[in-house]
């Protein structure tokens, strides 16, 4: 059986006492081996994390703030403008109101008109699950996927416990996109142009746009 031999290289700085050139053998670079089970786990475990997150978010609508957001969204679509005065306080109806959530309110109103509360709940689950997976993808590179998933389990428990149909669900998505871009700017600098678009939408959906 023939055996591959490494190619000898000459090191000009390494010489014997007599002045003769010394040859050293350099081992060839070996391809990194990844078992089929490791390849499957690299995609399967994050997929399971996303599935558990999605299913955990499919619970009935409990948050009572949803309804005034929905009514405000209906008002915006009916009048074609964002309210400038308080719509809901009888004793102080002329107080100026800066509606920081109008983008979210229009979104849930459109979803509600198409599929009712059920579609709003599914959309919430999709948005928050996407936020989790994007943030998972953005962080922990170089760690074994099992460790990364294990570290994310407590976070998912907290996120699901707070997974309401509120404007903050969009903040979770936009913040995860910011993280994803930030961790890739050194390799893909053009991604920076995505951030103004994200920020423009975010600033019209939730007050936590200041995190971006």
Feature map (PLM): residue ranges:
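Start-transfer (signal-anchor) and selected internal transmembrane alpha helices
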Residues: 1-55
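Membrane-interface alpha helices of multi-pass inner-membrane proteins
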Residues: 53, 155-159, 181, 192-207, ...
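Helix-to-loop transition at the C-terminal end of transmembrane segments
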Residues: 54-70
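Extracytosolic helix-loop segments that constitute the early lumenal/periplasmic catalytic or substrate-binding loops
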Residues: 74-95, 103
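Short hydrophobic/aromatic helix or loop-helix immediately within or flanking a transmembrane segment
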Residues: 91-118, 122
